[in-house]
Design a protein with these regions (language model features):
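Coupling/switch/interface segments within P-loop NTPase motor domains and analogous charged loops
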Residues: 15, 61, 65, 71-79, ...
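Short, solvent-exposed loop/turn segments at secondary-structure junctions
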Residues: 9-12, 46-54, 92-96, 127-128, ...
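Soluble or luminal CAZymes and related metallo-dependent hydrolases
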Residues: 6-10, 36, 61-69, 98, ...
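Conserved RecA-like P-loop NTPase helicase motor core
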Residues: 111, 115-195
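Short, well-ordered amphipathic alpha-helices
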Residues: 69-75, 86, 103-110, 181-187
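Conserved strand-helix element at the start of the C-terminal RecA-like helicase core
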Residues: 5, 28-40, 82-104
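Short helix-terminating capping/connector loops at secondary-structure junctions
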Residues: 30-33, 80-85, 115-118, 191-194
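Inter-lobe connector of SF1/SF2 helicase motors
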Residues: 1-61, 72-75
Length: 195
């Protein structure tokens, strides 16, 4: 189901700014090496994900995709504790790195809501085949209840759907084939959520 979030004041202002940038590019008023539609599209996608990705001076906002995702994940987590059902959060922008990133932000927020750190994992931390196998096995067993990863890291070819109850796309993948990884056979839980 779709989780609709109203635009924040900062996002509205930023969208006005990038609309002006797009018009300048269309009119040829700016060199393509300075600004272009690809940069504008990327900045728009980052802003839609979390305004802090385009303006680091902003504070945490509840009125964002990340804030809503964290609320949804926590609600589902506690509602499905008995069966140890699992969730995937897909995020292609702002993957784990030093400094501010969405993955660490989500993890901190989930921990603050009472989800144990050892039940939250980043697919990016499994940097060998052995670690990937162990991580995915832990997700299938319900030891890891929330896994965050990019479409590339945990999309096509990754089979962790056994206990999967929800998928959360906080940014949209470029390829339609990358959506809907939860709809598989041989699952413990048949009624699932995709947000």
């Amino acid at each position: 189901k779709d989780a609709l979030i109203s635009k924040s004041y900062d996002l509205k202002k930023y969208l006005e700014e990038i609309s002006k940038r797009a018009e300048a590019v269309r009119m040829g008023a700016v060199l393509r090496t300075v600004d272009n539609m690809l940069k504008i599209t990327t900045d728009g996608r980052k802003a839609a994900l979390d305004m802090r990705l385009v303006d680091s001076s902003l504070s945490v906002g509840c009125q964002s995709k990340v804030g809503r995702c964290v609320e949804n994940v926590a609600n589902i987590y506690f509602r499905t504790m008995k069966d140890r059902l699992t969730q995937v959060i897909f995020c292609d922008y702002s993957t784990p790195k030093k400094g501010f990133n969405i993955y660490d932000d989500i993890k901190v927020r989930l921990k603050n809501l009472g989800i144990p750190e050892n039940e939250i994992a980043f697919a990016h931390s499994a940097n060998t085949e052995k670690k990937r196998k162990q991580l995915f096995d832990d997700v299938r067993k319900g030891k890891i209840r929330v896994i965050l990863g990019s479409t590339f890291k945990i999309g096509m070819g990754v089979n962790i759907q056994d206990r999967l109850i929800a998928l959360h796309y906080i940014d949209v993948p470029w390829r339609p084939a990358d959506v809907g990884r939860i709809l598989r056979t041989f699952k413990i839980k048949k009624n699932v959520e995709v947000t």
